[in-house]
């Protein structure tokens, strides 16, 4: 009987019986654009689009019939539903006890079994045909003897929910797909029999409980080359080994296709005698050359003794593909493991590094990974030469061997590609390791990937929130959490960078121990950092180096268009910078705005602690604070390189015996086209300048507008605290006030000058304590002023026995072509003049 039409609606009380007296049964065929099965009493939809019903079930108000009507009909007839327009959806539970067949066909779309389908009768069958894919969202159970299931789809079949599975538990049950017949396995003995035909096609008819039995790997030193479809069923409670073989797993090696399989409570172990070829061990397969998809392993334990490659699911993925796989459990590589991974020990391309013939996609590992060797360990993959795409690892990765390479996702990415992947958890390494939240050692490409958690190692390590050591490309990636190391290179994103980091970000608490190097984004940079940022909180202990973005930027290092916003704290004898602790390379178009704080005898700069390279078109806005006998600058603490077109606006404060400048503390290099606006203060004796505290280099076309203050016996200048012999200042100016304590040298432009000052001006106010020497241009001049001007107000305090002059209190050098105007015009040019003053 055929019911055909554009829209068909079968009444709920319809009864169809095609049984004959001869024992044969006919079929009821429904062909329509709305040939779907609905749950009873659900509401609305339009054709081809499912909408949530009142009971949160997807429903078709225009469905041809409901599940109860279909179930009743299957008791008295075979039923064939054909959707002529779109997807055919079974949205209500269907069950029957007869030997009849349910046939479901979608001529133009998918067949979706969203609710349970169950038949208990002998010879009952279900046949599904789809132009697209068959999706099974619930249980499909055919439990009678000689039951048959047939699934035919251009795009195959998938089990889309965790509880979805097929049961074919009766005697002589059968299965076929796309014209191919499969053997149905019901027990451990059936698994063992796969050895007889390694090119065969198999399905699991039900879950298999091994009850703790020992099980030798399928294969007998040969690869499986057939099809093994678990149909959503689980194999559980086995103890797998493979004595005498280099590959250990449920399958020794897979060169075929394994899909839709669960593995639970399985322990797998490889023991490799000394001197033997390393073994590959994984719960599912030692080697994979084929295709693995939709495999879920839970509560598994994988371990090795001797040289081995160890993975939670696969030991070695050699040019194979693993998609939509997951592992939950424990992986232990022992003392001699080469590579250890939560999902795969290694992922190796046979074509070329980074080729997708070795592919892990949409997969996940939640595994505790432990290794005591100096090899590689990763939460997902130990060693990757292929592609890891849209995959995730969570849990703990702990490598205790010196020199190991450890990553939350991948231990070593050697020419491989990691894309849109994540790791979260706790990643730890020992001495001299490369440890990264995502990748331990990267010599490939990391794109659009993230880590969230804790990364830690001891001394001599390279520790990064995302990558421990980078010799490849890191792009558009992020790290959040904490990165810790002893006397190590520690970075919020990368511990040590020798290649490229771009468009990336870190928000990490970064902590390096004594003599360690810490950077908010990168610990040690000898490569290129471009368009990246961090708001990491960075700390380094005594004698360490700390930078808001980079700890140390080496001579080959470049920092371009990048920024740091977090605070930087360093201990005694340390070097700290808001952007870079030490710069021997190039910084261009970059900025920092966090506070910088350091202990005694330290060097602290708002942007860079110590600069021997180039700082260009960059700025800092954060405050800088350090303890006694330190060198501090609003932009750079100590400069022997070049500062060009850069500025600082944060306040600078430091203890006694220190050198402080609004831009640079100590300059032996070149400063040009630069400016400083912040207040500079030295508590006690020191050298303090609105721009430079102590200058033994060259300053040109620069300015300072902040106030400057220092204590007793100091050299204080609106622009330069002390300008040394051989130093020069040109085309520069100061407009802030300068104040010194007792016995200080205070100048509107320079506190104490032994060098050359040309074409420069001052226009602030100078003042001091008892016996202070105050000058509109310099407190004391032993060098040369050429074409300098001052409008400085010299504020004398009655009774303080101060010395003052419009140019200088003391002149033992030369003033040439200089002038005093405004508040300075009515004063003697010098209080004591033992040099020359001429037009």
Question: How should each PLM-predicted stretch be described?
Answer:
Residues 1-26, 140-142, 146:
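Repeat-solenoid scaffold signature
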Residues 9, 32-34:
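Alpha-helical scaffold domains
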Residues 35-839:
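Surface-exposed repetitive/solenoidal architectures
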């Amino acid at each position: 009987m055929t019911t055909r039409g554009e829209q068909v609606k079968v009444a709920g009380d319809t009864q169809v019986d095609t049984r004959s007296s001869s024992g044969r049964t006919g079929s009821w065929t429904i062909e329509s654009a709305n040939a779907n099965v609905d749950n009873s009493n659900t509401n609305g939809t339009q054709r081809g689009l499912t909408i949530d019903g009142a009971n949160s079930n997807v429903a078709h108000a225009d469905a041809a019939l409901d599940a109860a009507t279909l179930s009743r009909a299957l008791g008295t007839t075979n039923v064939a539903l054909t959707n002529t327009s779109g997807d055919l959806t079974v949205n209500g539970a269907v069950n029957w006890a007869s030997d009849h067949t349910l046939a479901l066909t979608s001529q133009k779309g998918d067949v979706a079994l969203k609710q349970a389908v169950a038949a208990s009768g002998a010879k009952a069958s279900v046949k599904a045909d789809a132009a697209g894919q068959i999706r099974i969202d619930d249980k499909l159970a055919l439990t009678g003897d000689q039951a048959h299931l047939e699934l035919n789809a251009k795009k195959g079949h998938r089990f889309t929910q965790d509880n979805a599975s097929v049961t074919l538990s009766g005697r002589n049950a059968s299965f076929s797909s796309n014209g191919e017949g499969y053997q149905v396995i019901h027990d451990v003995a059936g698994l063992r029999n796969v050895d007889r035909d390694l090119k065969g096609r198999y399905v699991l008819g039900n879950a298999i409980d091994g009850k703790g039995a020992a099980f030798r790997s399928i294969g007998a030193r040969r690869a499986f080359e057939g099809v093994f479809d678990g149909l959503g069923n689980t194999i559980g409670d086995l103890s797998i080994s493979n004595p005498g073989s280099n590959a250990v797993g449920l399958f020794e090696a897979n060169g075929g296709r394994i899909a839709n399989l669960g593995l639970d409570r399985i322990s797998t172990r490889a023991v490799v005698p000394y001197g033997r070829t390393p073994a590959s061990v994984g719960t599912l397969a030692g080697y994979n050359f084929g295709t693995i998809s939709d495999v879920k392993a839970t509560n598994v334990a994988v371990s090795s003794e001797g040289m081995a490659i160890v993975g939670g699911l696969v030991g070695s993925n050699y040019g194979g593909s693993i998609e939509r796989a997951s592992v939950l459990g424990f992986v232990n590589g022992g003392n001699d493991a080469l590579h250890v991974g939560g999902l795969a020990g290694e992922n190796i391309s046979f074509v070329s590094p980074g080729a997708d013939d070795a592919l892990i996609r949409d997969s996940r590992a939640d595994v505790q990974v432990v290794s005591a060797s100096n090899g590689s360990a990763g939460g997902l993959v130990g060693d990757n030469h292929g592609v890891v795409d849209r995959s995730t690892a969570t849990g703990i990765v702990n490598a205790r061997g010196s020199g190991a390479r450890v990553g939350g996702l991948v231990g070593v990415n050697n020419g491989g590609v990691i894309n849109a992947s994540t790791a979260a958890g706790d990643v730890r390494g020992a001495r001299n390791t490369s440890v990264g939240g995502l990748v331990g050692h990267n010599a490939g490409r990391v794109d659009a990937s993230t880590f969230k958690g804790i990364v830690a190692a001891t001394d001599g390590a390279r520790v990064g929130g995302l990558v421990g050591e980078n010799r490849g490309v890191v792009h558009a990636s992020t790290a959040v959490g904490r990165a810790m190391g002893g006397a190590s290179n520690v970075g919020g994103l990368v511990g040590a960078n020798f290649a490229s980091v771009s468009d990336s970000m870190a928000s990490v608490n970064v902590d390096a121990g004594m003599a360690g190097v810490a950077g908010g984004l990168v610990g040690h940079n000898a490569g290129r950092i471009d368009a990246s940022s961090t708001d990491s909180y960075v700390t380094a202990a005594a004698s360490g180096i700390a930078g808001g973005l980079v700890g140390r930027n080496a001579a080959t290092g470049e920092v371009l268009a990048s920024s740091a916003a977090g605070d930087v704290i360093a201990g005694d004898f340390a070097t700290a910078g808001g952007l870079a602790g030490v710069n021997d390379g190039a910084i261009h178009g970059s900025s920092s705005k966090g506070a910088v704080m350091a202990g005694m005898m330290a060097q602290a700069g708002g942007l860079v602690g110590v600069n021997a390279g180039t700082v260009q078109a960059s700025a800092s806005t954060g405050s800088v604070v350090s303890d006694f006998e330190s060198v501090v600058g609003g932009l750079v603490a100590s400069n022997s390189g070049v500062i060009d077109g850069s500025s600082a606006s944060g306040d600078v404060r430091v203890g006694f015996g220190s050198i402080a400048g609004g831009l640079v503390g100590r300059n032996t290099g070149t400063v040009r086209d630069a400016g400083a606006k912040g207040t500079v203060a030295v508590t006690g004796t020191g050298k303090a300048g609105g721009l430079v505290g102590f200058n033994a280099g060259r300053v040109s076309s620069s300015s300072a507008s902040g106030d400057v203050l220092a204590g007793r016996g100091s050299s204080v200048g609106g622009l330069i605290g002390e300008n040394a012999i051989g130093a020069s200042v040109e085309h520069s100016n100061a407009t802030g006030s300068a104040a010194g304590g007792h016995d200080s040298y205070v100048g509107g432009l320079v506190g104490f000058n032994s060098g050359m000052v040309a074409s420069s001006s001052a226009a602030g106010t100078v003042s001091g304590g008892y016996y202070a020497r105050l000058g509109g241009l310099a407190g004391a001049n032993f060098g040369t002023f050429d074409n300098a001007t001052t409008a400085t107000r010299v504020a004398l305090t009655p009774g303080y026995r101060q010395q003052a002059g419009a140019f200088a209190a003391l002149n033992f050098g030369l003033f040439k072509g200089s002038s005093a105007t405004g508040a300075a015009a009515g004063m003697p040019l010098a209080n004591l003049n033992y040099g020359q003053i001429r037009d």
